[in-house]
């Protein structure tokens, strides 16, 4: 009999508590149904009015968005139903606590029978209406706490219920607190994926910019490796800067004729290749200035192919054309030291012997020898441009870089003006008349 009485009480309690929960669930469900109906009405209105003027692809896109919105609404409905079920679970416990003091005999009847069987029968009804399992477990724990008091002490049962209303209150707050995070996934789902990826990339870039000044070895290394390379040529600009205007190519000559200025090269390279010091070079220049009167016959005897006493480019061309480049090198190497120093030209042969150029066999090397002239003219006449004070640079071939194919002509001494150069090249057959 007490079991049946308990069943009736449980059914009465469920009947008493269910209407409020049902009203809440129905109110929320009605709002959700109104949302779905509004979306459907929107789709119907779109189908009726604006979809007439849209293409098939645009209609598909609109339908896709409507379906996604409906799916998001359905996903949002599930936690709402769970909240309603929890409220239904909490309300019966409250009503039990309120009804227990008014009916102490019913509480005594509930304690006497086997608690396992009675609770197992009463709880499924609550769980069917509730849904979530953790809330059902909490309800079982609350029921397990109430039965232990013995039969006779009714006042203890009266004192026991007051803590019960305080215990279900925290679950309500704990269940309502996570409700804002329930809307958070909805916001993440509604945000397009490209925007999320762009935000992540921007955050990473901002983090890298923040880390680059503090940790230059991570992000700033490529920049640091580039800056010294960029600053290197800047610091070295003053050195090679003046060398660019010192090597002008005459635009009026053909491309196969290259005219270089020997005095515009760096003195360190030339002196190191010639293996002579500045003092020795000055002594050679002085000897050349004082003793060039009888130097040309000695040079002719040595086999350099220049007729003595003449300084015209025509004679120089004929005398230079008799022996080949190799023969002139051999003759310069076999020439004695005395007349060579007096003439000043064997210094160029020494330079060629120490650093033979790779383009000597391919082309011709012409050196126009000056006649008797003043020292200032001998030392200064060449292409206009920055010159070294040392006049010995005029007697040497200063460039040992290989030229593809061409003729290197070095002018020095008297008659090195533009007309003399053109006349000499014309007689050699190296100048093409443009007119």
Swiss-Prot record:
Residues 11-20 have a biased composition (Polar residues). The keyword Cell division does not apply. Residues 146-169 have a biased composition (Pro residues). Pfam families: SARG (PF15385). The modification Dimethylated arginine is found at residue 320. Residues 92-102, 113-126, 228-237 have a biased composition (Low complexity). This is Proline and serine-rich protein 2. The lineage of its organism: Eukaryota, Metazoa, Chordata, Craniata, Vertebrata. The gene is PROSER2.
């Amino acid at each position: 009999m007490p079991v049946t009485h308990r069943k009736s009480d449980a059914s009465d309690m469920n009947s008493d508590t269910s209407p409020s929960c049902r009203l809440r669930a129905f109110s929320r469900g009605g709002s959700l149904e109104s949302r779905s109906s509004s979306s459907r009405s929107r789709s119907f209105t779109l189908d009726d009015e604006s979809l007439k003027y849209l293409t098939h692809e645009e209609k598909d896109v609109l339908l896709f968005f409507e379906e996604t919105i409906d799916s998001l609404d359905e996903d949002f409905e599930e936690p709402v139903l769970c909240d309603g079920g929890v409220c239904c679970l909490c309300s019966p416990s409250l009503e039990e606590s309120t009804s227990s003091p008014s009916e102490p005999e019913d509480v005594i009847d509930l304690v006497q029978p086997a608690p396992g069987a009675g609770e197992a029968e009463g709880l499924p009804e609550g769980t069917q209406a509730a849904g979530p399992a953790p809330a059902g477990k909490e309800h079982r724990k609350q029921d397990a706490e109430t039965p232990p008091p013995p039969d006779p002490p009714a006042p203890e049962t009266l004192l026991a219920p007051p803590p019960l209303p305080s215990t279900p209150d925290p679950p309500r707050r704990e269940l309502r607190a996570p409700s804002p995070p329930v809307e958070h996934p909805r916001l993440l789902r509604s945000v397009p994926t490209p925007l999320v990826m762009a935000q992540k990339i921007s955050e990473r870039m901002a983090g890298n910019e923040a880390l680059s000044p503090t940790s230059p070895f991570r992000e700033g290394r490529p920049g640091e490796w580039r800056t010294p390379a960029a600053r290197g040529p800047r610091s070295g600009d003053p050195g090679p800067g003046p060398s660019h205007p010192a090597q002008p190519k005459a635009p009026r000559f053909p491309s196969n004729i290259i005219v270089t200025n020997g005095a515009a090269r760096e003195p360190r390279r030339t002196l190191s290749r010639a293996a002579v010091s500045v003092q020795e070079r000055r002594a050679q220049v002085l000897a050349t200035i004082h003793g060039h009167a009888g130097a040309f016959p000695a040079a002719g005897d040595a086999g350099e192919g220049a007729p003595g006493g003449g300084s015209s480019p025509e004679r120089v061309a004929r005398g230079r054309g008799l022996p080949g480049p190799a023969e002139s090198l051999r003759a310069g190497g076999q020439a004695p030291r005395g007349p060579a120093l007096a003439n000043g030209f064997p210094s160029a042969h020494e330079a060629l012997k120490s650093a033979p150029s790779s383009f000597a066999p391919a082309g011709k090397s012409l050196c126009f020898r000056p006649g008797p002239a003043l020292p200032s003219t001998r030392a200064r006449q060449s292409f206009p441009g920055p010159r070294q004070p040392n006049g010995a640079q005029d007697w040497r071939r200063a460039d040992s870089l290989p030229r593809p194919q061409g003729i290197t002509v070095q002018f020095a001494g008297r008659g090195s003006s533009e007309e003399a150069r053109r006349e000499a090249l014309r007689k050699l057959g190296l100048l093409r008349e443009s007119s």
